[in-house]
A protein has these predicted regions:
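Membrane-embedded alpha-helical bundles of multi-pass transporters/translocases
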Residues: 1-297
Length: 297
């Protein structure tokens, strides 16, 4: 599931930049061309269906190995609600659930704004954006042993908080560096390697945190089973997934508010956008992300 999630997302980002949204020799196409997104959506939907079927059919044989709860003759709706509420009273679950809400909002906002920063702020073309997924795939492979090593060296909570703090501080570093005239201009050949290196480290740390966070959720399942004498992993992981999906949409909404507040013009070419608009975009987005991620702690 996690493999399809990360490699599928990275692979689709590569296909988007190199196939569906690539720029033609005549100057047509590219990130800002609407026509390519329709084909991209169809291809993504088909691959998502294949991924779900492979995951479901590939794990179906393990159903017999799962914990089988005791048979109960009659289950009333009120009893189900009572058991769900009892599970959600677990303090560790409540902490991780709230962290999912704030971090999911920040992640949704960051994902929605990333294409605007890449296109308008950094002036990257589709051919350059296609390089990033390659580095992200390598980062995903590096993150697994790093997360394992951190989990063994420290307890999961300390390792997760440490990686999360690093992510908060490191994420907006390039944006603030540009405002401080430390990062090279867009026409510099040094800029793309710097952005690739920054993105590699950032994605690696994000995946490390995701792995540690998932391991902490598994510990909550065991803790809840001790308190309630019931296995409630379905409720716990469903609640976490629901929180992430629900508030990622809220993050996209906040991204739209930020774009409106910064007065980013519609249908404008990157070279036609005023510098102050881009500065405002950074000053609205970066502190907002920092606040949301900090609240997740």
């Amino acid at each position: 599931r996690y493999m399809f999630g990360w490699l599928g997302g990275i692979g689709m980002a590569f296909l988007a930049s190199s196939v569906f949204l690539r720029e033609t020799e005549g100057g047509e196409g590219g990130i800002l061309a609407a026509t390519g997104y329709g084909y991209y959506g169809i291809a993504a939907a088909c691959l998502m269906f294949v991924g779900m079927m492979v995951s479901s059919l590939g794990t179906h044989r393990h159903i017999g190995q799962l914990h089988v709860p005791p048979v109960r003759d009659k289950i009333k709706i009120g009893q189900v609600v009572s058991e769900v509420l009892e599970t959600m009273k677990n303090r560790s679950f409540q902490s991780l659930f709230l962290a999912s809400i704030f971090s999911g909002t920040a992640a949704g906002m960051q994902a929605a704004l990333s294409i605007y920063f890449a296109t308008f702020f950094w002036g990257l073309k589709a051919s350059e954006l296609a390089i990033f997924p390659i580095f992200q795939a390598v980062a995903a492979c590096c993150a697994v042993p790093i997360a394992h090593a951190l989990g063994k060296r420290f307890d999961k909570k300390r390792a997760a908080i440490g990686s999360f703090l690093f992510m908060i501080c490191f994420g907006p570093l390039m944006l603030f560096g540009r405002l401080a005239d430390i990062v090279p201009e867009n026409d510099s050949p040094v800029l793309l390697p710097l952005l690739l290196g920054h993105n590699f480290v950032e994605v690696c740390v994000i995946i490390v945190f995701s792995i540690l966070f998932g391991a902490m959720m598994a510990d909550v399942v065991e803790d809840s089973a001790v308190d309630t004498t019931r296995r409630s992993e379905g409720v716990i992981f469903a609640a976490r997934g629901f929180a992430g999906k629900m508030v990622s949409g809220l993050g996209i909404l906040l991204a739209g508010v930020i774009l409106s507040a910064a007065n980013l013009p519609r249908n404008a070419a990157p070279e036609d956008v005023d510098v102050q608009v881009l500065v405002d975009l950074v000053l609205y987005a970066a502190p907002g992300q920092i606040v949301l991620y900090t609240l997740a702690l």
